[in-house]
Amino acid sequence: MSQNTLVLATGNAGKVAELRHMLSQTHATADWLVRPQSEWDFAEADETGTTFVENAIIKARHACQQTGLPAIADDSGLAVTALNGAPGVYSARYAGGNATDSDNINKLLKALEGVEESQRQASFHCVLVYMQSAEDPTPIICQGRWDGHILTHPVGEEGFGYDPVFWVKEKNCSAAQLSKTEKQALSHRGQALKQLLEQLAK
């Protein structure tokens, strides 16, 4: 890759921090200048897609158009089986356009009131898209999935989003109780980024 400045096409501070950390820990990208799109003065893309893939492409293309630089976009969310896959692509705004993480968690827990533990399966999904330019005809698209189940109350202080209510069976704790390194090794975003870095290294 000739251009070592990379735009992270997201306004989500948690995603920016997580992606920056992961990229800095990887030899192939340790020397990249990773800049969130908030460093430029332009509005976020309208996420009009109905899938994570569509929205990630929309965001990556928009960031490339606005900055003239390569971009990585992340579209991700939580799918809860008992809620027919909700909140899905609406995860970040489940409780409304200006919802906080706590607002979204509270709405989720309310929606799952009375649902037995054995029926609270859920999965985090992440789609990462890399585009060299806005006209890139072959964006790199990588996907990750992380299975778990939803707790009845938040546990842990790390992470962001729905992490405090997402139980990670193999670690016997919530996602919000994992270290950054542990989470990177297991998470949907870590899986997708590993695939993306392998593609970029080719």
UniProtKB/Swiss-Prot annotation:
InterPro entries: dITP/XTP_pyrophosphatase, ITPase-like_fam, RdgB/HAM1. GO terms for biological process: nucleotide metabolic process; purine nucleoside triphosphate catabolic process. Mg(2+) binds at residues 46, 75. Keywords: Hydrolase, Magnesium, Metal-binding, Nucleotide metabolism, Nucleotide-binding. It catalyses: XTP + H2O = XMP + diphosphate + H(+); dITP + H2O = dIMP + diphosphate + H(+); ITP + H2O = IMP + diphosphate + H(+). GO terms for molecular function: dITP diphosphatase activity; ITP diphosphatase activity; metal ion binding; nucleotide binding; ribonucleoside triphosphate phosphatase activity; XTP diphosphatase activity. The active site is at residue 75. The keyword Hydrolase applies. Binds 1 Mg(2+) ion per subunit. Substrate binds at residues 10-15, 76, 160-163, 183, 188-189. Its cofactor is Mg(2+). Homodimer. Belongs to the HAM1 NTPase family. Pyrophosphatase that catalyzes the hydrolysis of nucleoside triphosphates to their monophosphate derivatives, with a high preference for the non-canonical purine nucleotides XTP (xanthosine triphosphate), dITP (deoxyinosine triphosphate) and ITP. Seems to function as a house-cleaning enzyme that removes non-canonical purine nucleotides from the nucleotide pool, thus preventing their incorporation into DNA/RNA and avoiding chromosomal lesions. This is dITP/XTP pyrophosphatase. It comes from Idiomarina loihiensis (strain ATCC BAA-735 / DSM 15497 / L2-TR).
